[in-house]
Design a protein with these regions (language model features):
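Bacterial N-terminal signal peptides
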Residues: 8-17
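Eukaryotic scaffold repeat domains enriched in small/polar residues
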Residues: 23-348
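Bacterial N-terminal signal peptides that target proteins for export
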Residues: 1-9
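Hydrophobic membrane-targeting alpha-helices
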Residues: 16-19, 289
Length: 348
């Protein structure tokens, strides 16, 4: 774990870079296991309706659960606090193509991030569209081709497969713009651009990203970015000045910060094995529970398809830090998880 002070020290670190790949790829050892259970058969689906790749999950203040998933098409489902299906939001929406994330803000507005349409859509608690950031690639004839190459060319004036959205206490919007542009962008609450961090190209230095895959904002307005390809979490203040790097979390696919006076950071460590025929099968599967300063409280879970195991966690709702909703890509499911924390010493 590395820390940076604001101002000249941060600039010096940026210029010098971080030496030593072992430092960047450090993994937490001797982390205590947190006892937990998965609630069996929690979600009650309508006949012939199933989850696909479960990309995002979020709860509102009433405890209703939103699941954003994709099979042949992208769909957003709402469930009541007991897991009973309520309704589908925006079926066959122009903004739905390849789901990536759903979040609920402090006013119970529902936001979806679709990496296929490059759109972030804000909806009222009743389901009315209030704001759209980004634009779906359009063509007069046929389909717009996805940018090719490794890495693909950046799309700095547009979103390039965005991945997540979050807000600070003032309502400013932060978007991780993810697979192509490798940056985080800050907008005001009305959607006006303020600033961005990231070089628009993959990089491993501080202030650079290799697929910023998820983000979360704490009560002080600090932004925690899951820099998945670099196996770290970069922490920025509200002006997107680097404050710390946590490199003890493995391969972070998802981050979530719980509300309340004592906030916790949850981070999923998913490591698909590219050498297997099913390259998306997770071989780690654990979720870390952390203090906001990067100390690890404990971890739970392991890779697998059984109840209480995880296959590539892509979404975590931690509105209640002892009762999580966890969505998985490879297992095509969503689990309700109850933690039974024990008193432990945090690990750095």
């Amino acid at each position: 774990m590395k820390r940076y002070s604001v101002g000249c020290a941060a600039l010096a670190v940026l210029l010098m870079g971080v030496t030593g790949s072992a430092q960047n790829k450090a993994r937490a050892e001797n982390v205590p296991e947190i006892p937990f259970e998965s609630v069996a058969n929690f979600f009650k689906m309508p006949p012939d309706v199933y989850f696909g790749e479960s990309m995002g999950v979020a709860r509102n203040s009433k405890g209703n659960i939103f699941v954003y998933h994709r099979r042949d098409d992208t769909r957003l489902f709402e469930f009541d606090p007991n897991g009973t299906f309520v309704r589908e939001w925006l079926p066959n929406s122009y903004g739905h193509e390849f789901a990536h994330k759903v979040r609920v803000d402090r006013e119970d507005n529902v936001w979806v991030v679709d990496e296929g349409t490059n759109m972030i859509i804000k909806m009222s608690p009743e389901g009315r569209v209030l704001m759209v950031l980004g634009r779906r690639p359009e063509a007069v004839e046929g389909a717009v081709e996805t940018p090719q190459g490794d890495p693909p060319p950046d799309e700095r004036y547009l979103f390039g497969r965005p991945t997540d959205v979050g807000w600070d206490p003032q309502g400013n919007i932060f978007i991780s713009d993810g697979y192509i542009n490798h940056r985080v962008v800050k907008f005001d609450r009305n959607g006006r651009f303020i600033r961005k961090v990231g070089s628009n190209l993959r990089g491993s230095e501080p202030y650079q990203f290799n697929t910023p895959h998820s983000l979360a904002v704490d009560a002080q307005g600090n932004v925690y970015v899951a820099d998945r390809g670099n196996q770290r979490i970069q922490v920025f203040d509200n002006n997107l000045v680097l404050r710390a790097i946590y490199d003890n979390v493995g391969n972070p696919w998802e981050v979530c910060i719980s509300p309340g006076p004592h906030q916790y950071l949850f981070s999923s460590n998913s490591n698909p094995d590219s050498n297997t025929p099913a390259a998306s099968w997770d071989v780690t599967g654990e979720i870390y529970k952390m203090e906001l300063d990067g100390r690890i409280v404990g971890k739970f879970g392991r890779a697998g398809k059984q109840l209480g195991q995880f296959q590539t966690v892509h979404g975590i709702d931690c509105r209640n830090p002892d009762e999580l909703i966890v969505s998985e890509i490879s297992a095509w499911r969503v689990q309700k998880i109850r933690l039974r924390p024990t008193t432990t010493t945090s690990s750095r």
